[in-house]
Amino acid sequence: MESTAKLSFARLSPRKTRLVVDMVRGKGIQNALNTLRFSPQPSAKLVSKLLSSAVANAEQKGVADVDRLYVKTIYVDGGTVLKRFVPRAMGRASKIRKPTSHICVVLAEKK
């Protein structure tokens, strides 16, 4: 049985978030959470919360053994980019791009 969790419009760069997501793909839940706990990346905290949410979803569905869950698929898609402007000298303006990410996690039981 599979359980999913999604996080939309996270104010994180998709490129930087993919580095964190690649560390936990295919690992068991406890191993993945420990890996994220000691990662210095800011996106690791949100990904660990998302994994915990997916585990809670699995418990609600009635998965027999939560300890047998592993990260089947996890991926990051780019969301909308918030565009802002900063005033510069001589009446100019510079563009600031604030990227967002959509993260999706699918957990499954080991056979």
Swiss-Prot record:
Q: Does the keyword RNA-binding apply?
A: yes
Q: One GO CC annotation, please?
A: cytosolic large ribosomal subunit
- Which UniProt keywords are listed? Ribonucleoprotein, Ribosomal protein, RNA-binding, rRNA-binding
Please give the start and end residues of each transmembrane region.
Answer: none
Domain of life (superkingdom): Bacteria
- Report any one BP term from Gene Ontology: translation
**Which SUPFAM superfamilies does UniProt cross-reference here?**
Ribosomal protein L22
Q: Provide any one GO MF term from the record.
A: structural constituent of ribosome
Which Pfam families has this protein been placed in?
Answer: Ribosomal_L22
Q: Which residues form a coiled coil?
A: none
Role: This protein binds specifically to 23S rRNA; its binding is stimulated by other ribosomal proteins, e.g. L4, L17, and L20. It is important during the early stages of 50S assembly. It makes multiple contacts with different domains of the 23S rRNA in the assembled 50S subunit and ribosome. The globular domain of the protein is located near the polypeptide exit tunnel on the outside of the subunit, while an extended beta-hairpin is found that lines the wall of the exit tunnel in the center of the 70S ribosome.
**Similarity-based family:** Belongs to the universal ribosomal protein uL22 family.
**Assembly behavior:** Part of the 50S ribosomal subunit.
Listed name of the protein: Large ribosomal subunit protein uL22
Q: Which organism is it from?
A: Geotalea daltonii (strain DSM 22248 / JCM 15807 / FRC-32) (Geobacter daltonii)
